[in-house]
Amino acid sequence: MMYKLGVLLIICLLLFPLTAVPQDGDQPADRPAERMQDDISFEHDRFFDPVKRCCKYGWTCWLGCSPCCG
């Protein structure tokens, strides 16, 4: 019985290593400088109109550009 549990434990550790589980230190809230560098907002979208402060075309809203001009 103990042998089977040991084999099962080894198989589980090989399939799901502990390094695959995200640690607390890997959270974006702990790294504000990197979070600021990775800022991908709608203002950097090629369909965004900076004068109107909205997306140029209505169909671009389906692609994730927001807010829509209407």
From Swiss-Prot:
List of residues that carry Cysteine amide: 69
GO cellular component, as recorded: extracellular region
Disulfide bridge partners, by residue number: 54-69, 55-65, 61-68
UniProt-listed InterPro entries: Conotoxin
Location of the protein in the cell: Secreted
GO molecular function annotations of the record: ion channel inhibitor activity; sodium channel regulator activity; toxin activity
Keyword Disulfide bond on entry: yes
Keyword Secreted applies: yes
Signal peptide coordinates: 1-20
Major localization class: secreted
Tissue specificity field: Expressed by the venom duct.
Prodomain positions: 21-53
Keywords recorded for this protein, A-Z: Amidation, Cleavage on pair of basic residues, Disulfide bond, Hydroxylation, Ion channel impairing toxin, Neurotoxin, Secreted, Signal, Toxin, Voltage-gated sodium channel impairing toxin
Post-translational modification summary for this protein: Contains 3 disulfide bonds.
Positions of modified residues (4-hydroxyproline): 67
Function: Mu-conotoxins block voltage-gated sodium channels (Nav).
Family per similarity comment: Belongs to the conotoxin M superfamily.
Domain notes: The cysteine framework is III (CC-C-C-CC). Classified in the M-2 branch, since 2 residues stand between the fourth and the fifth cysteine residues.
Name listed for the protein in its UniProt record: Mu-conotoxin-like Am3.4
